[in-house]
Amino acid sequence: MNNLPELDLHGEYSFSSEVLVKEFINDNIVLHNKKICIVHGIGEGILKTTVHNLLKKDKRIEKYYIDFFNPGCTIVEIKKEYLWVNLLLFLDQAELVKER
């Protein structure tokens, strides 16, 4: 096991998996997780293709690759600057709350 936050897309359709992946990336940026795992399965590769096409277009993604030990899983690395921007926004909001 890789102990990364994991999204399992087994049983999902291509169009719904796009929404789930985007939400999963957003959630993990908020949580400051640099690496995540998206499980698409091996099968015919439809979900894998959908996920990889989505990741290829997402400017927040540094890189992605098939997990060496589990070819049904893609490891995704989020660019550090997106994690830091979110952290700075969070800290700024925390200061506003503290001032009240």
Map each language-model feature to its residues.
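Long, charged, low-complexity intrinsically disordered regions
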Residues: M1-R100
